[in-house]
């Protein structure tokens, strides 16, 4: 990604201190289990290690480390029974979920030959799970439980831990980067309008405002021909251009992409919401004509660029890009009642990483429908198979909500006028999907990603403390 972020995950383990002097062999046993457990965390996150906690004081020290690091998530390994005072001081002042990992070392007891230290050390991780949840509830903390086994391996446990770490990346990205708003939202699309101060207070995402006048001149100082030529080739490698593409044909576009990439790094931008409604003449017209592919080049590098000034869908695109590797702006395009499928897509910038069925294409159109000017239009070709849609909306009090649906993209004819579109079948049927999705009150834009990601989105929502409306799976 152009702007890298790395989630910070607080990790610690707990055990009842009274056991250790009674059964000293538990000390190396627990140290080994905890060391092995930490290896399960992917290297995509920064581990903040709170150690093995057996006293309230150790728990408070772990909490100090977690607060100082501003952790995005806490993962707690239950080694054996422990009282909740080993846990609660570490998380009391945090506003992130606590994932309780109840992973038993042995798959099953050897009933006749199990002594007390063997039971306590290898078979008793489940002893305090309910107690921990009870006290997390009373403390108003969000929580989750993962149960599994070490012996023989447990891919489900590994997958859940990695999924939580992916979800934690979203919080870190929202906190450590900025959103660029260029211009203003499309006039009259009031569902897109947003209070940027409320956005920061609720989601920790800061909005930087930019005028188009600055953007028109952004490429004026880009003169390194080797850099421009390399970026032009990158554009040609990304898109098939109608009528053929050459380095010379996309030279000016490449200059803008290079400039935008540097701007994104300088301003630490991971989200862009833009809309231009001027006269599209002179330098303004030049940039407007090639903005769609230029922003598409940013999207494939992890910068969510949303048209029509839609900040909320930029967030949705970034979430899906972060957890799945692709995030494509979409909206309801049509319903094929004969086939009982929804046609979903959008014009404008898109994510080359979703275009797995065919190389993205680019062509010149005389007019951008509903907008100022004309120029390059890009089309992307999502593959047949599972697809996830994510919309973000707000209630009357400014609280955010996620709206999610999973479906299946099917083969068949699509529109050919240059916009990305896909044929999605939903388990509830096209008619009912449209009713349910609309009744959930989303903005008219949504983000799309290949695969099924509802479970990960639910984790993201728990981390961000946002409700979720699952429309269909």
Predicted regions, residues:
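Periplasmic-binding protein-like
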Residues: 71-80, 99-101, 269-275
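Short beta-strand elements in bilobed, periplasmic/extracellular small-molecule ligand-binding domains
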Residues: 31-55, 142-148, 205-211
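Short, acidic/small-residue loops that bind anionic groups at enzyme active sites
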Residues: 89-116, 120-128, 293-308
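Long, internal scaffold/assembly segments composed of regular secondary structure
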Residues: 231-323
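Extended hydrophobic packing segments that form well-structured cores
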Residues: 370-473
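Short, well-structured alpha-helical segments in soluble
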Residues: 59-71, 88-90, 257-266
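C-terminal catalytic subdomain
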Residues: 296-416
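Cap/lid and interdomain-hinge subdomains that line or gate substrate/regulatory clefts
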Residues: 2, 6-9, 107-232, 236-239
């Amino acid at each position: 990604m152009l702007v890298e972020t790395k989630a910070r995950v607080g990790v610690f383990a707990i055990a009842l201190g009274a056991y250790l002097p009674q059964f000293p062999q538990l000390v190396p046993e627990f140290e080994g289990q905890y060391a092995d457990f930490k290896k399960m965390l992917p290297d995509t996150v920064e581990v903040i290690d709170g150690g093995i906690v057996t006293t309230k004081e150790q728990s408070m020290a772990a909490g100090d480390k977690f607060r100082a690091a501003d952790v995005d998530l806490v993962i707690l390994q239950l080694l054996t029974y422990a009282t909740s005072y080993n846990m609660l001081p570490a998380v009391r002042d945090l506003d992130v979920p606590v994932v309780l990992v109840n992973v038993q070392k042995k798959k099953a007891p050897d009933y006749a030959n199990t002594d007390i230290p063997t039971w306590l050390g290898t078979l008793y991780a489940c002893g305090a799970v309910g107690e921990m949840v009870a006290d997390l509830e009373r403390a108003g903390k969000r929580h989750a439980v993962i149960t599994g086994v070490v012996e023989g391996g447990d891919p489900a446990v590994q997958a859940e831990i990695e999924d939580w770490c992916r979800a934690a990346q979203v919080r870190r990205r929202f906190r450590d980067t900025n959103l660029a708003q260029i211009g203003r939202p499309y006039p009259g699309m009031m569902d897109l309008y947003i209070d940027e101060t409320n956005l920061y207070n609720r989601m920790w995402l800061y909005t930087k405002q930019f005028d188009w006048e600055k953007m028109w001149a952004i490429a004026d100082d880009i003169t390194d021909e080797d850099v421009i030529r390399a970026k032009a080739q990158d554009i040609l490698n990304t898109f098939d251009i109608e009528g053929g593409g050459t380095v010379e044909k996309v030279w000016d576009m490449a200059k803008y992409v290079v400039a935008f990439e540097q701007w994104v790094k300088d301003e630490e931008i991971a989200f862009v919401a833009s809309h231009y409604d001027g006269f599209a003449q002179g330098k303004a017209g030049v940039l407007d004509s090639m903005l769609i592919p230029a922003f598409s080049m940013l999207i494939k590098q992890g910068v969510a660029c949303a048209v029509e000034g839609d900040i909320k869908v930029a967030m949705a695109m970034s979430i899906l890009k972060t957890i799945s590797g692709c995030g494509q702006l979409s909206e309801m395009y049509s319903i094929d009642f004969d086939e009982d499928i929804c046609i979903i897509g959008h014009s404008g910038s898109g994510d080359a990483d979703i275009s797995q069925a065919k190389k993205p294409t680019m062509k010149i159109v005389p007019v951008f429908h509903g907008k100022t000017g004309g120029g390059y239009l890009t089309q992307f070709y999502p593959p047949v198979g599972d697809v996830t849609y994510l919309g973000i909306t707000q209630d009357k009090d400014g609280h955010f909500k996620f709206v999610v649906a999973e479906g299946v993209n099917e083969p068949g004819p699509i529109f050919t006028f240059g916009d990305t579109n896909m044929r999605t079948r939903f388990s509830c049927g096209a008619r009912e999907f449209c009713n349910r999705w609309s009744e959930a009150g989303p903005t008219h834009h949504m983000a799309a990603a290949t695969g099924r990601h509802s479970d990960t989105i639910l984790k993201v929502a728990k981390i961000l403390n946002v409700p979720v409306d699952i429309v269909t799976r």
